[in-house]
Amino acid sequence: MSEKFSPTLRLGDLNDFIAPSQACVISLKDSKPIVKKSDRPQVVIAPKQQLEPVKISLKDCLACSGCITSAETVMLEKQSLDEFLSALSKGKDVVVSVSPQSRASLAVHYDISPLQVFKKLTTFLKSLGVKAVFDTSCSRDLVLIESCNEFVSRYKQANSDDGENSQSPLPVLSSACPGWICYAEKQLGSYVLPYVSSVKSPQQAIGAAIKHHLCQALGLRLHEVYHVTVMPCYDKKLEAARDDFVFDDGTQDNGDLKLTEVDSVLTTGEIMDLIKLKGVDFKDLEESPLDRVLTNVTEEGDLYGVAGSSGGYAETIFRHAAKALFGQTIEGPLEFKTLRNSDFREVTLQLEGKTVLKFALCYGFQNLQNIVRRVKTRKCDYQYVEIMACPAGCLNGGGQIKPKTGQSQKELIHSLEATYMNDTTLNTDPYQNPTAKRLFEEWLKEPGSNEAKKYLHTQYHPVVKSVTSQLNNW
């Protein structure tokens, strides 16, 4: 069984002889009437029917209470290098968005800086026919701004006179990790989902920016644009395939054409495989100028963004909430207190001897269970929790490049963190990002607006776990 997916999405006792159609429990139809039959024996000669082969897509995996089996290569055929190369060969307008975690992984592997990686990767991808290479740090700033607005709104609502009846209670649980979201929908259901932030992940936010704004601004035909993201996590492939991120073309000629915000997701490891496949010496590639339209890069050529290696959600929202709710400007680094282990930390804001804000970082499913129990028993005293399924967070995603010979996973994570934090990247406030400001002015209007809710928010769906009820429909 492949270890690429997060533990929640794997079924450990399956082998490679099990095909998706055998393991999947999703029904072919929503309902089938129950027909009462007589107990008397009957002989019926029915005409032979030519049955169509059953096809199971990746969306089916997200819609049922099954799991990804060892035949995930079949289900993920549209999330592969072959599909990416096929889109290029068909003359599609291919756009690639690269995550900062993937850049850090490539930087450590090739022993160069993340900025050099980005410029060389731009050279490499454009040599294949890619039209533009963007930076998901840009969309992450959009998401952080919207998340700050969401938290302040939910905090005020929860602390109002009618706070007990709030439909958006505290704590707010972050939503950027697809492994955590899939687990919450399939295993935790309705008692946890109301706490989850409705703000999209940076991957889906940049997909929305490209498909719902940039294409229109540049006069591109939506069905000709093929958007690919490079991510540290295989579960991002599942996220991109959700029905929530499918939309209509909107034109008269292609009114029934279904499009997705992200057409395909490639992991960092798959990008390295592509480099090897093309026989390229990556370190010897020239460094191309970066595409500035959706990239956090200064006029001097430096990258900028938040410092958090898993998105910086807790820190950014904590600083904003301290200022917006209590008038406190926090200078310098936040002092996170380590609790059970380095993957479970908390930070508090004290005013006049009273704790007014209490946030937590929670990485890995072992620590996640602790938070879930507290939420379920209504004993969680945090107002916000940044949750990631992988221990050590996104830098340790299953799609990252594996350790070199003689290097331990722990040593690799330390190298990734040092590279990510000590990069030439400038640590900046998302609210000061000129690209984010422009996108709000031209497209989203302001944080919390109807446009922002339409394009930067999503919803979650508790999945019924009863296999019996599903089998009744077969």
Curated annotation (Swiss-Prot):
The keyword Protein biosynthesis does not apply. GO terms for molecular function: 4 iron, 4 sulfur cluster binding; metal ion binding. Its main location: nucleus. SUPFAM superfamilies: Fe-only hydrogenase. InterPro entries: Cytosolic_Fe-S_CAF (IPR050340), Fe_hydrogenase (IPR009016), Fe_hydrogenase_lsu_C (IPR004108), Fe_hydrogenase_ssu (IPR003149). GO terms for cellular component: cytosol; nucleus. Keywords: 4Fe-4S, Cytoplasm, Iron, Iron-sulfur, Metal-binding, Nucleus. Expressed in developing tissues, including shoot apex, young leaves, vascular tissues, root tips, pedicels, carpels and developing seeds. It holds the Pfam family Fe_hyd_SSU. GO terms for biological process: response to oxygen levels. It is found in: Nucleus; Cytoplasm. The keyword Iron-sulfur applies. Disulfide bonds: none annotated. [4Fe-4S] cluster 2 binds at C177, C233, C390, C394. [4Fe-4S] cluster 1 binds at C24, C61, C64, C67. Disruption phenotype: Embryonic lethality when homozygous. Part of a complex composed of AE7, CIA1, MMS19 and NAR1. Interacts with CIA1. Essential component of the cytosolic iron-sulfur (Fe-S) protein assembly (CIA) machinery. Required for the maturation of extramitochondrial Fe/S proteins. Required for expression of the imprinted FWA gene, for seed development and is involved in the oxidative stress response in vegetative tissues. Involved in the regulation of cell size, ploidy and cell cycle progression. Required for growth under normoxic conditions and necessary for recovery after hypoxic treatment but its action is reactive oxygen species (ROS) independent. Belongs to the NARF family. Coordinates probably two (Fe-S) clusters with different magnetic properties. Knockdown mutants have a dwarf phenotype, but are indistinguishable from wild type under hypoxic conditions. This is Protein NAR1. The gene is NAR1.
